[in-house]
Amino acid sequence: MRNNMDQRHELVSTLLAIYRNEHVRPAKDEARRIADFIESATATDPSLTYDEFGLNRTILALKAIRLAVDEIGIRGHALTAYLLRAVVSKPDQCELVERYFGKDVAQTLRGFLRVEAIEVKTEAMRTDNFRNLLVSQAGDMRIVLMLIADCVNLMRHIKDTENVEAQRKVSTEAAYLYAPLAHKLGLYKLKSELEDLSLKYLEHDAYYMIKENLNATKRSRDAYIERFIAPIRKMLDAEGLRYHMKGRTKSIHSIWQKMKKQQCGFHGVYDLFAIRIILDSPIAKEKEQCWKVFSLITNKYESNLKRLRDWLTVPKSNGYESLHITVKGPEDKWVEVQIRTERMDEIAEHGLAAHWRYKGVKSSGGGVDSWLADIRSALETGNEGLLTQSLSSNAKEREVYVFSPKGDLYRLPPRSTVLDFAYTIHTGVGNRCVGGRIDGKNYSIRQPLESGQTG
């Protein structure tokens, strides 16, 4: 009994610490209600206490919430819904959740359950269509953000598991589903962590081969970086610019991809690192000073203009801004140099979380990529009502993603019917179609389809 009381006190205290921002739910009473709900659920069904890795579901969820708050910037009822997801597995339980915690929490929880109901097949998971299906089924962009945080947190905690099969399944989802979504959202730090951890679990020998080689060559690499940046430092100082520089070793996953693409060993990859120059510039002078540094560097070192990447003039759809150039340094080695400001660097590293501080970065485009990028402006408001309106996805107004009986995933226009799906598969199938069987039930050719269905 004493142990249960201690756990309850710890849960409430942890919740209050995580939800410390005055604009973030829950208040003290709600923290206690959450504790009551979880305590009751696990007492009724003890199997809800631990997951397939033997980890305590509630404690694991609390750690994921802290990650989501600190590293992504998520706020509001999505956090409560995610925590309750640890002990709620059936849609009909959401009615009870709504009575305890309100409509918004229950609706978000239903989104989590819809995503969990999707049957994940590795072949389909590798496609943009599957990622778009997940986004569509979630219905609320914060659910997708929480799922990214959930995946990162879980990957951090399963390194010593004996359940290797489950570890490989989670790692595959991390590599092909959540890392690409994190990339689209500009969450590069989390994306890189997911990629490295998935490689560690899926390609153990390759991961440690690269890691050991990086450790063995660190001293010579650091010495080369110092020789490369010394003249640049003198030039920047002479111009009176405020800045700092660092050499950034490419991620293990990135190096592994280069080795496969170039069909070479570790020592055949020439660009193991990049130099990052980060300027302390006022926003009004950001571009001017970045291009000034570009001019100084290309005057000093021979440049490869084919490798110029200008994301200052036109930022990436996820808000990424930087200027990349590859130049020939000492010993005729090609070196990538990234030029950006403090603001740009924080957004590049922390994505959405940084946009709570830096306002006004906008993107344009179409489709799901544009939608993912545009949620940034809604997150900046901090207004729960506007967030709900801006982040909610009306599936009926978006593309429909449906599976064929063989498990292939198809993207269809909004309001597509059984007949539309038949013609998408093959003209002959459409010509012969007089009805369809969707999720085991018969429907007319005019029946509208919903994302996630199997026809």
Model segments located where?
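Nucleic-acid processing machinery
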Residues: R2-H23, T42-Y50, L60, R66-D70, ...
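Alpha-helical scaffolds flanking conserved acidic
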Residues: I59-K63, I74-L84, D104-T108, R142-L145, ...
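Generic structural signal for well-ordered secondary structure
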Residues: A31, R57-A61, G76-H77, K90, ...
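N-terminal alpha-helical scaffold/docking segments in eukaryotic complex subunits
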Residues: V24-I34
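Hydrophobic or amphipathic alpha-helical targeting/insertion segments
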Residues: A81-V115, L187
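Short alpha-helical scaffolding segments that buttress acidic/His motifs in well-ordered protein cores
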Residues: I34-A41, A78-L84, T108-L113, V144-M155, ...
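An amphipathic alpha-helix signature
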Residues: L16, R32-A35, I65, C94, ...
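Outer-membrane beta-barrel domain signature
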Residues: D51-L55
